[in-house]
């Protein structure tokens, strides 16, 4: 039987992130085969390179700062504004990049990868 424990973090901003993708920090809050939940903080004026996931949804919840997600997929292409408290669900197979619109403040968001089993990060040609 798979033993699971309760996870409680009083202040997610007190977690220590590691450098991820060279221009942001990532602090993993919870990970099971069904999903991974992390706090990402994109540095001021930076962005995460365009990429896709072939099997995994990206669920974004903006918690501070101001960003946007530029996307392209079978439904066309567009921009999802991500001010504080915004939500975006990015399906597998959609190219997307996360941009911090501020040059002075980080853009922080909770990111849930679901499922975590089989997670893949595939850079696209314009990366």
What are these regions (language model features)?
Residues 35, 44, 55-56, 94-95, ...:
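A generic "binding-loop/recognition-motif" signal
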Residues 1-38, 49-50, 79-84, 88, ...:
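A short, N-terminal "cap"/entry segment at the start of jelly-roll beta-barrel domains
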Residues 56-84, 99:
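A short beta-strand-loop-beta hairpin characteristic of the jelly-roll/cupin
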Residues 39-40, 51, 57-63, 88:
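His/acidic/aromatic-lined binding-pocket segments of jelly-roll/cupin-type domains
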Residues 33-34, 55, 74, 103-104:
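Short strand-connecting beta-turns/loops that link adjacent beta-strands
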Residues 81-84, 92-119:
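Ligand-binding loop in jelly-roll beta-barrel domains
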Residues 47-49, 68, 86-88, 92-98:
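Histidine-centered metal-chelating micro-motifs
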Residues 50-52, 112:
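Intrinsically disordered, low-complexity cationic segments
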């Amino acid at each position: 039987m798979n033993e699971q424990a309760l996870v409680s973090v009083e202040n997610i901003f007190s977690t220590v992130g590691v450098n991820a993708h060279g221009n942001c920090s990532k602090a993993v809050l919870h990970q099971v085969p069904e999903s991974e939940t992390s706090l990402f903080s994109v540095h001021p004026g930076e962005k995460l390179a365009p990429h896709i996931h072939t099997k995994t949804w990206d669920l974004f919840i903006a918690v501070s700062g101001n960003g946007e997600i530029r996307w392209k997929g079978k439904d066309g292409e567009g921009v999802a504004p991500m001010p504080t408290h915004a939500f975006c669900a990015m399906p597998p197979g959609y190219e997307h990049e996360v941009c911090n619109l501020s040059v002075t403040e980080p853009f922080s968001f909770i990111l849930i990868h679901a499922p975590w089993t089989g997670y893949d990060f595939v850079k696209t040609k314009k990366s």
